[in-house]
Amino acid sequence: MDVREAIQQEAGAETGFASVTFNQDESCFSCANEQGFLVYNTFPLSLKLTKEFKQTPERGAGIGYSQMLYRTNYIALVGGGQRPRYSLNRVVIWDDLQQKESFSLKFMSIVRKVVLSRVHLVVALENELFIYSFHSTPKLLCPPIKTAPFGPFDFKVVTIEGKATDQAKVTSLLAYPSAKLTGQLHVADLSKLRSNQNNNQDMALTSESFLPTTIIKAHKAPIRNVRINNQGTMVATASRKGTLIRIFSTHNGILLKEFRRGLDRAEIYDMCFSPLGTRLAVVSDKQTLHVFQIAPMAEGTLNPANPEDHQSSGSNGHIKANTNQVHSLRNIVPTSWKPKYLDSVWSMCKVHLRNPKLRNNVNDLAFNEDRCTIAWCRQNRSHTFKNGNHFNENEENKLVLVWKNSRIWEKYVILEKEAPNSNDGIKGPSPLTEWELVRESWREL
């Protein structure tokens, strides 16, 4: 007879998080674990909520995925871990104020991801997206949307401020890879979703009959990552090859920017637009964080509502020109001989990510396998552009990374390098501004 006791986790020892997700405005993030979930304030970092479910012989407490609804008391949960609280094919909306389940949805396969808004609830399975109304009795708004197997998707709620006499317009954008054509992206405006009055008859139709989409030919390889900016004007994509990042207009699908991460293949596992959409942060399995400059950042010049304006990268008076890096031979080699590689645009700054708990840049193999989630720090103080857009330069310069397995929170800042002094007396074009990413602080969670 085996009388050995089960190995118990040592007191004070912590396991990694099953998932880390930021809320819709990136002011908070939730972490799912074997006991339940935690909620932190992004910046300044502080623990806001700890929820530990009670385990029984019949039922565990593990949560595999959690997603907040802004800073409300509602949070979407999916079971996970060694002893899941809920089945892996079930989505539960937890009301932390009432300390009970508000409602739940059950599916035929494992739930990969859930996103929320005050109006919609989107659930991702292996190759399908389900769009429901966010209500105590949720209604399926259209037939399931077929996507590429395990394909990424992004969902963004955009508020467009009207004139003094007009009400603000709220729209919801959904971007997902095509199930039929490799590298093709669909962008849908859920405000154009046709009303489904007859569930039994209408569900026999395809999702295209309910939801028109903008089709973008993004890559030749399968799409690995998709992100929509906060203004809903741009969508960034990366393929499984991981060498190029492309940014398209959500209005007409035209290519606005193309950036090069590197020459070798890499898995780009997270991307994030800055609050104003002037920069894009990208992290890959090379454990390198890149920041790309999309548009000049100067008071009174940026209009996120017109992404086509971002194609201009020249310098105009006090406006800082594009600060991304380019090849030194770009303007030397004749166009007729020049390979496309020489026209590539690299990041404005990058940093190799290392475990902050280790000194002397020791290579940590476990940390190299870890994955982080990116967000940008937002602050209350800001001033306003002449065109009415709120602007805070600090919001475009500060990033937060949260690591799943290591349970580490890091804050990075983008700093301008000092320009070298020129004493030769020769006047010429101003050198390209150089930037660097510096870790400002970190904490264990």
From Swiss-Prot:
Record's GO cellular component terms: cytoplasmic vesicle membrane; endosome; fungal-type vacuole; vacuolar membrane
Membrane topology: Peripheral membrane protein
Biased composition (Polar residues): 312-321
Transmembrane segments: none
Region (Disordered): 301-321
GO BP terms, alphabetized: piecemeal microautophagy of the nucleus; protein transport
InterPro entries in alphabetical order: PROPPIN, WD40/YVTN_repeat-like_dom_sf, WD40_repeat_dom_sf, WD40_rpt
Residue ranges of WD repeats: 218-258, 263-302
Predominant location category: membrane
SMART domains hit by this protein: WD40
Location(s) in or outside the cell: Vacuole membrane; Cytoplasmic vesicle membrane
GO molecular function: phosphatidylinositol-3,5-bisphosphate binding; phosphatidylinositol-3-phosphate binding; phosphatidylinositol-4-phosphate binding; phosphatidylinositol-5-phosphate binding
Gene3D superfamilies, per the entry: YVTN repeat-like/Quinoprotein amine dehydrogenase
Pfam families with a match to the protein in the record: PROPPIN
Sorted UniProt keywords: Cytoplasmic vesicle, Membrane, Protein transport, Repeat, Transport, Vacuole, WD repeat
Role of this protein: Involved in mitochondrial or peroxisomal functions and amino acid signaling pathways.
Sequence similarity: Belongs to the WD repeat PROPPIN family.
Domain comment as written in the entry: May contain a beta-propeller domain involved in specific binding to phosphatidylinositol 3,5-bisphosphate (PIP2), leading to the association of the protein to the membrane.
Name this polypeptide is given: SVP1-like protein 2
Species, as recorded: Candida glabrata (strain ATCC 2001 / BCRC 20586 / JCM 3761 / NBRC 0622 / NRRL Y-65 / CBS 138) (Yeast)
Gene name for this UniProt entry: HSV2
